[in-house]
A protein has these predicted regions:
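Active-site neighborhood of HAD-like aspartate-dependent phosphohydrolases
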Residues: 2-47, 71-72
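Tryptophan-centric aromatic hotspots in well-structured domains and transmembrane helices
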Residues: 25-29, 87-90, 128, 183
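Alpha-helix C-terminal capping segments
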Residues: 27-36, 66-71, 97-101, 120-124, ...
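A metal-dependent, Asp-based hydrolase signature
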Residues: 35-36, 40-44, 48-81
Length: 220
């Protein structure tokens, strides 16, 4: 693990959701399902299963179960995995990571299997300081343990870190851990019922850098 002298203007560590904050997995899910409506229904059922399953169950198993539950054929999960290495990167994501690299350690905390999570993380072309998947943590977000594992591996308290979410459900977990959170709400989802309000929210990534560099963003 690399050791980086912290910049006074930034937190020591910035953690990211991967599949919705940095990568456009929506497009691949929708394509595998055959339409946006079918893809959203499939994704919603998958999320329901992950948030209710407790200890980790294989990601691929939950994806298949969700497809069956909403009436999709077995070819849909197969198409999703076939398109995995073509997950689009959101515009501005690589530029943001490059701008942060001199100032912060960077990590990913993702609801995914180890196999697919590390493959997806590699698409950004970043030398990540930590990549934590739900399989490695033993639980799916928003359980606190995946975020806590990433912070522990970087030997950094939550007070000296920040999180960039792609889902409003991350806010439940980051609040418990004490991570300041920017919600990159690219597709305009409603805040989940009962979820804490994020420190900042935008449909774009351009606001992340000034938010992190703002006075008071770094630990005192």
């Amino acid at each position: 693990m690399s050791v980086l002298a912290p910049s006074a203007a930034y937190p020591r560590v910035v953690l990211f959701d991967l599949l919705t904050a940095l990568l456009d997995s929506w497009t691949v899910w929708n394509g595998a399902a055959g339409s946006e409506a079918k893809g959203r229904a499939w994704r919603a059922e998958y999320l329901r299963l992950t948030y209710g399953c407790g200890a980790y169950r294989p990601y691929e198993e939950l994806v298949e179960a969700a497809a069956t539950a909403v009436g999709l054929p077995a070819s849909a999960p197969q198409a999703l995995e076939s398109g995995w290495d073509d997950l689009p990167v959101w515009d501005g994501a690589r530029e943001l990571l490059a701008a942060l690299r001199p100032h912060c350690r960077l990590g990913v905390v993702t609801n995914c299997s180890r196999r697919l999570g590390h493959r997806a993380a590699a698409l950004l072309g970043v030398a990540w300081d930590v990549v934590v998947t739900s399989e490695e943590a033993g639980y799916y977000k928003p359980d606190p343990r995946p975020y806590q594992m990433a912070l522990a591996r970087l030997e950094t308290p939550a007070s000296q870190a920040a999180f960039v979410a792609g889902s409003g459900y991350d806010l439940f977990g980051t609040r418990k851990v004490g991570l300041r959170t920017y919600w990159h709400n690219r597709v305009g989802l409603a805040l989940p019922q009962g979820a804490p309000t994020p420190a900042a929210q935008s449909p774009r990534l351009e606001g992340v850098l000034p938010w992190l560099a703002a006075p008071g963003a770094a630990p005192g």
